[in-house]
């Protein structure tokens, strides 16, 4: 398997849905087994997918996209977009008047360049049918309110503090942690740069979303320390009551080492917040 997940020299693909930028897809140099690339699932709006393409220095001649059954055995739709530019709209909802998003499907996108192709994969579903928008809105609200340490906005009633939560550290926070730890203690973090949102699962029961981003916090020596954060949500939207419930929450943060900053004081090495059990 050859993937170029972080290389800026390779084109990058993401999707827009209801104002959210979602699912930055890794690019593969070779076609993949469709049953082995299930890391993300992308909601479709009114039969259309809005694709954002960062070409960098590459010249993209055309884009092919193919919709398959989820097991990859049946090809349902195949289309081409010439000179797609930075944004493209993919029509994926209907074939000969028949709705092909009545169930989960697999999407393959191929970018054709001068001397090579790149392949991208995601599962796709009907976003409105599975209440994707209100679920994403809930995640965004919880995420932003936790960062801001906002009170009276439902965080305290959504979490389930118990002995399962480790309230001695901010490195790993869960739905079982207390309100103080879920809302970042005294760190007052500021998001640095963009956030990467990946929908890991979306079905009739729940949505699972993972956020990746960096934050700046004041460290032990009153300097700004930077941390890499992963924040996971599993939520359920109930159409009848129009309410969203938090089913699971898990957040980790690890300090990004900066050799230009002071790393020693009279107490020894300044470690910041890191995993107690690094791999």
Model-derived regions: residue spans:
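Short, cysteine-centered beta-strand-loop-beta hairpins and adjacent loop/turn segments enriched
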Residues: 212-228
């Amino acid at each position: 398997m050859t993937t170029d997940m972080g290389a800026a020299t390779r084109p990058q693909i993401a999707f827009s849905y209801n104002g959210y930028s979602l699912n930055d897809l890794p690019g593969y140099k070779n076609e993949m087994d469709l049953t082995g690339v299930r890391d993300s699932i992308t909601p479709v709006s009114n039969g259309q997918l809005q694709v954002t393409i960062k070409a960098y220095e590459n010249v993209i001649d055309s884009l092919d996209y193919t919709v398959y059954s989820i097991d990859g055995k049946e090809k349902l739709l195949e289309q081409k977009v010439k000179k797609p530019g930075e944004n493209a709209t993919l029509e994926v909802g209907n074939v000969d008047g028949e709705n092909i998003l009545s169930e989960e499907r697999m999407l393959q996108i191929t970018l054709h360049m001068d001397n090579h192709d790149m392949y991208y994969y995601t599962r796709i579903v009907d976003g409105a049918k599975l209440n994707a928008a209100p679920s994403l809105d809930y995640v965004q609200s919880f995420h932003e309110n936790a960062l801001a340490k906002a009170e009276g906005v439902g965080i305290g009633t959504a979490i389930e503090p118990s002995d399962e939560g480790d309230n001695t550290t901010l490195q790993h926070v869960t739905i079982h942690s207390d309100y103080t730890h879920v809302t970042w203690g005294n760190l007052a973090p500021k998001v640095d740069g963009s956030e990467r949102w990946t929908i890991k699962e979306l079905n009739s029961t729940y949505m699972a979303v993972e956020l990746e981003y960096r934050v700046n916090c004041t460290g032990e020596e009153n300097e700004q320390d930077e941390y890499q954060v992963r924040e996971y949500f599993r939520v359920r939207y109930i159409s009848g009551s129009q309410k969203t419930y938090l089913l699971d929450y898990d957040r980790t943060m690890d300090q990004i080492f900066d050799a230009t900053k002071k790393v020693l004081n009279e107490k020894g090495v300044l470690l910041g917040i890191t995993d107690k059990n690094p791999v």
